[in-house]
Regions:
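Surface-exposed ligand/attachment interfaces on beta-rich extracellular proteins
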Residues: 43-53, 60-82, 91-114, 157-169
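Residues that act as N-cap/strand-start positions at coil-to-secondary-structure junctions
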Residues: 12, 25, 71-73, 133
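Generic beta-strand structural signal
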Residues: 26, 35, 81, 140-142
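Intrinsic low-complexity, repeat-rich intrinsically disordered segments enriched
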Residues: 1-65, 89, 93-98
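Short, structured beta-strand segments at or near domain termini in extracellular proteins/domains
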Residues: 169-181
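Residue-level detector of beta-strand structural context in well-folded domains
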Residues: 16, 22, 75-77, 137
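Terminal beta-strand-rich extracellular "head" domains
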Residues: 92-145, 150-151
Length: 181
């Protein structure tokens, strides 16, 4: 039932669209969009965007992996998806990296868009027990399928994508990466 200042209206009396001359406040409950692909329309705002419809929001967990032959002590990930933008956070503690494993992180809740630039950056918040001498460890999202680690070694001048040999025993990493789907 919709209550107005002067009277009440039953649900079967409401016709869409409803235009109200001010703010709408829900004192309890949620605003539920009942049709897939619909959302909050921001087209009344200035700008020249290609889309002004917020049609998706999701939070959840995922399980990051560097391959089926690795053994893990900790393996957890969290994500937030707003529209076509995804932010991943994850923690890995790898007990042993075995053949068939790599520095490619799989198990993503959403694949990066094949239409985005080849490399979309992230940040490694913490890394410990790299098997090789490295000045830094970075992370990026590859268009279409996965995220991957890279390092800048003390013996080279540029960044290189690494094989699983870069991961040492009890390798710890906390990282975040953002990309479009």
């Amino acid at each position: 039932m919709l209550k107005t200042v002067t009277n009440s209206i039953n649900a079967n009396q409401i016709q869409t669209p409803i235009t109200l001359p001010g703010d709408v406040t829900l004192s309890t409950g949620n605003l539920v969009i009942g049709t897939s692909g619909k959302g909050i329309d921001f087209s009344a705002t200035p700008g020249t965007g290609t889309s002004e419809l917020l049609a998706d929001y999701e939070e959840g967990t995922w399980t990051p992996s560097v391959g089926s032959n690795a053994t893990y002590i900790a393996q957890s990930g969290y994500y937030t998806k707003i529209g076509n933008f995804v932010k991943l956070r994850f923690i890995l503690t790898i007990d042993a990296i075995n053949s068939g494993s790599s520095t490619t992180i799989t198990g993503l809740p959403f694949n990066p868009s094949a239409n985005q630039p080849v490399i979309v950056g992230g940040v490694v918040c913490y890394a410990n027990n790299l098997a090789t001498a490295a000045l830094s460890l970075g992370i990026y999202a590859q268009n279409g399928s996965f995220i991957r680690f890279f390092t800048r070694n003390t013996s080279s001048t540029g960044a290189t994508t690494q094989s699983a040999a870069v991961i040492g025993t009890l390798f710890d990493v906390y990282a975040e990466v953002s990309y479009q789907v």
